[in-house]
């Protein structure tokens, strides 16, 4: 597994997708999804220039964060999995970003538990854009209520939205979901002009070009960088 080669391929695909939309490649950030991957794989990605990583499991993520901090390696860590209220403290204390915020209760706990010597925790509201019962996230019509709640929490910084649309090979269906997200993103920026709303996290290994076409500013890629995961699943590549 040549991680540097894989990262180069992904960056080329990002560049191609951006050129087709007359976008600067620098407007799309690559988040390497490193869940279930060993420290050695993350280190290889870091040595190839990758500095932002996404983890789905709290304890696994914290162990990796602590290892790299002990080595003096400064990485940016995003929590991208569903979060139970009894695990909020670890996310608040260790991660830089939390992308799956979908409840005021979780927001309150993260705000209370964020160390005061750290910068505010960057958060994204997760939208259940395909209305799937199996997926986390709030309904689109609930977005503004939660966003205004977060706005009043001093140790959180609302940066935008995140979504995991229902997997499909149909390009039109992909783009339909992503365009809905872009509309919500623009609405959020208009309603909260004083917040740093600049991040629309959508697009994974199989639908990245469609996501970039529809305005994504952050793509979450795991399989195409690190290879197949170490357990059997068909979703959330």
Curated annotation (Swiss-Prot):
PROSITE patterns, alphabetized: UPF0001
Keyword annotations of the record: Pyridoxal phosphate
UniProt keyword NADP present: no
Keyword Oxidoreductase in record: no
Gene Ontology, cellular component aspect: cytoplasm
InterPro entries, per database record: Ala_racemase_N, PLP-binding_barrel, PyrdxlP_homeostasis
Pfam families: Ala_racemase_N (PF01168)
A molecular-function term among this protein's GO annotations: pyridoxal phosphate binding
Top-level division of the source organism's lineage: Bacteria
Modified residues (N6-(pyridoxal phosphate)lysine): 35
Primary role: Pyridoxal 5'-phosphate (PLP)-binding protein, which is involved in PLP homeostasis.
Family to which the UniProt record says this protein belongs: Belongs to the pyridoxal phosphate-binding protein YggS/PROSC family.
NCBIfam families with a match to the protein in the record: YggS family pyridoxal phosphate-dependent enzyme (TIGR00044)
HAMAP family: PLP_homeostasis (MF_02087)
Protein name listed in UniProt: Pyridoxal phosphate homeostasis protein
Organism of origin: Haemophilus influenzae (strain ATCC 51907 / DSM 11121 / KW20 / Rd)
